[in-house]
Amino acid sequence: MLNDFYKQFKSGTDIRGVASEGVEGQSVNLTDDVVADMADGFVLWLSKKVSKKPSELKISVGRDSRISGPHIMKITTERFKRCGAEVLCCQLASTPSMFMTTVDLGCDGALQITASHHPFNRNGLKFFTREGGLEGSDIEEILLYAQNGEHPEESNGGNITDVDYMSDYAKGLCEKIKKEVNAEDYEHPLKGFRIVVGAGNGAGGFYADKVLSVLGADTTGSRYLEPDGMFPNHVPNPEAKEAMDSICEAVRESGADLGVIFDTDVDRGGAVDSKGNEINRNRLVAVAAAIALEGNDGGMIVTDSITSSGLKQFIENDLGGKHYRYRRGYKNVIDKALELNAQGINCPLAIETSGHAAMRENYFLDDGAYLCTKIIIKAAQMRKEGKELDELTASLKEPLESTEIRYKILEKDFRACGEKIIADLTKYAEEQDGWCVADDNREGIRVSFDRDNGDGWFLLRLSVHDPIMPLNVESDSEGGVKTICDKLGEFLKTTTGLDL
């Protein structure tokens, strides 16, 4: 069982911690020794997983732009070499590209050094095999090896080779765009397009230089392509308002046809249309669903729990697909899509409103660059027909009002507290006039309200990892969100354990 020290590093299916000084009250816990022990733990886990000796393993290592990345890369690559493994050092790379090294380069495992959109002082380890990302139980096993001080046998046969895999990965995206757009100028299918990229000083700058420009697009007006692990301009997160405001502004100022935005390690993406309108959250899911359902008539789209009622109508009524509203957590939606496909259900897409999108045609890998590539292909195809990308989701009904409130749970056993509140609220909701508890909800409690009681819905759930209860509310009527919040507030006042 993990002790408290090692338990702090587990973040869902990743390892995360503090790797650099610079934030008051946050001491470095991803020390050199701890990172080395975690690297050894991965070797032991991977050796068992693929039934190979540590000295027979082939492991790739990449990193995003954060300041501690080069140092952690040096520690981990040396540890892998020490046990005799063949190590491919990919330097600055996207997280999805590291998975692809298991496909294209025959790696048994891959390590990406990243902490996604978190602040500059944090970093982490994200692992892959040819089956995809690891499960939470796998991370616990790796941390347990580290905690117990278990190390693979040393061997002199290891080596470290620098590999520019990102160039090969980018070429793969280029070839996909060429083939699917099939332009008259085959080598330059994006000629005449102006597409701006918002990389947020993360690892996504390659998309402007090695993909779009190569294919003939004008990327003038792109922002923050240079990797800078201090993230001086804005949080590299497509969900953050300042990040989306920046790329929307870039599109408007440059007169671009399209804008694309990535998080730090490029496993998430978003877009902006030519009018400067955001294509993220529900609208991003709608665009991705429309693309994924082409050739997959009646297919099922798996999403997280906070999608709107209008999105469900769009997927099922306008696109002719089926909507499976699941739980928050990108690994949850991906695993559910894999499960449904294994049952013989046609499920081409798993997507979170956060921008994690995984397509069956791409190994169910959540890849922001691949998602944006599919959107760009669709925009180019529609231009041939004299259409604009925004026409794809013109019938999507969006709420008039929406909000999110995050309630802190004050109880030590926050999960038990949150679960009791949800159970009590379910009973309460079933007794209220004008309240309708959703029977297809799979996380927390979702309640719809008729026109006289707020004309919308709320979802109250437990956070995946934190002592938080997020509340999402949408309404199709002016003042509806306040009405719904007031009605829910009457119940919440009777609870204990929430910071209201």
Regions found by a protein language model. Name each.
Residues 81, 90, 143-175, 274-353, ...:
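Proline/glycine-rich low-complexity loops and linkers
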Residues 54-64, 88, 194-196, 299-305, ...:
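Short glycine-rich phosphate-binding loop at a beta-alpha junction
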Residues 1-76, 82-83, 159-195:
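An N-terminal, well-structured beta->alpha segment
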Residues 123-254:
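Gly/Ser/Thr-enriched, mixed-charge loops and adjacent short helices
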Residues 44, 48, 52, 58-122, ...:
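N-terminal small/polar loop signature for handling phosphorylated ligands or for N-terminal nucleophile
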Residues 296-472, 477-500:
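Phosphate-binding and adjacent anionic-ligand microenvironments
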Residues 7-24, 199, 203, 349-353, ...:
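Conserved phosphate/anionic-ligand binding catalytic regions in large, soluble enzymes, centered on
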